[in-house]
Amino acid sequence: MIIKPRVRGFICVTTHPAGCAASVREQIAYVARRGPIERGPKKVLVIGASTGYGLAARIAAAFGAGAATLGVFFERAPADAKPGTAGWYNSAAFHDEAAARGLQATSVNGDAFSDEIKHKTIDAIRRDLGQVDLVVYSAAAPRRTHPKTGVTHQSTLKPIGHAVRLRGIDTDNEAIKETLLQPATPDEIADTVAVMGGEDWRMWIDALDAAGVLADGAKTTAFTYLGEQVTHDIYWNGSIGEAKKDLDRTVLALRGKLAARGGDARVSVLKAVVTQASSAIPMMPLYLSLLFKVMKARGTHEGCIEQVDGLLRDSLYGAQPHVDAEGRLRADRLELDPAVQARVLELWDQVTDDNLYTLTDFAGYKAEFLRLFGFGIDGVDYDAPVEPNVRIPNLIE
């Protein structure tokens, strides 16, 4: 079938298998050009492994360090001529490329928040890897059913204590708009922490440790975004910020647990990139469009693979890791360059409907958004029929 992009709001409801595969190959090629990751991990579990930063971590570990990988994700398979999700096709392509290079790859498809998927993952580690020496936590979901209580918690993107008016882009109409966000209630804050805080990461590490599948010296990291002044009202100072603070508290306990066996636990702070999640946040398309414009002009623009490959080489396995005062690994230094942030702030209120394409890189933002779903990738013929029914080998469901 011939597959074209169909966008509804902040979701593209179609995905292109060949485009997703080409995107994965591009990321692999980037890692390969940088050469081997010295003293890198050899057996890696990635929780949230099918898109964005989690996929980039799996690619960097496998094709940079030669690691065997086990990826956990929750994706929809193609069925009845309906394409699967982008994460499904990304993972299928990863398996194909890993197999071609003799790299062990196993994947588990299901709800990473559940006890069932944790148990299936542990069984797969025992069977295929024995133990893991790196656990990357990159799960991103709007809701979580708690495995012990059965309660489903829904995360909320709201300020705390007062309403906040945010500038942004109505991406459907390509117009500047303002959104008034009301403050979160105590229950909404608690629910957001339950979904996006550190509890599930801790549950994973506790389960892996109790099962004896964490190697001595094992490391774990959870990915997060903090941002700077322009995004603080809804990130660090909002409901999501409370979840991020919970992550910072959780990592201290995990670090103590792993340090006893020569290991480590860190929160890794990454730069803002286009994801399905970020595109749904009222101010982020405008912020990203301005950030792209400024960073591309300076030659410092990076995407997921550049960020995570650098994180592994420079900090997780580097001799001189970039660590902040709270003990987090920082890969967002170029975004937070004072000159970059000052220029973004300077332009923020100047953007109008008329100059959207000149003052910002909204065109680049839209292109990155479509790339998430396999569209706009160099070398792919989008007028040619493509087979949507792609399977993932070694898949556990």
Swiss-Prot record:
Active site, UniProt feature: Y235
Lineage top rank: taxon: Bacteria
Residues reported in the UniProt entry to bind substrate: Y225
Record field: catalytic activity: a 2,3-saturated acyl-[ACP] + NAD(+) = a (2E)-enoyl-[ACP] + NADH + H(+)
Site keyed Plays an important role in discriminating NADH against NADPH: positions: E75
Pfam families: Eno-Rase_FAD_bd, Eno-Rase_NADH_b, Enoyl_reductase
Quaternary state and interactors: Monomer.
Matching NCBIfam families: EnoyACPredFabV, PRK13656.1
Protein known as: Enoyl-[acyl-carrier-protein] reductase [NADH]
Species assigned in the record: Burkholderia pseudomallei (strain 1710b)
Gene name as annotated: fabV
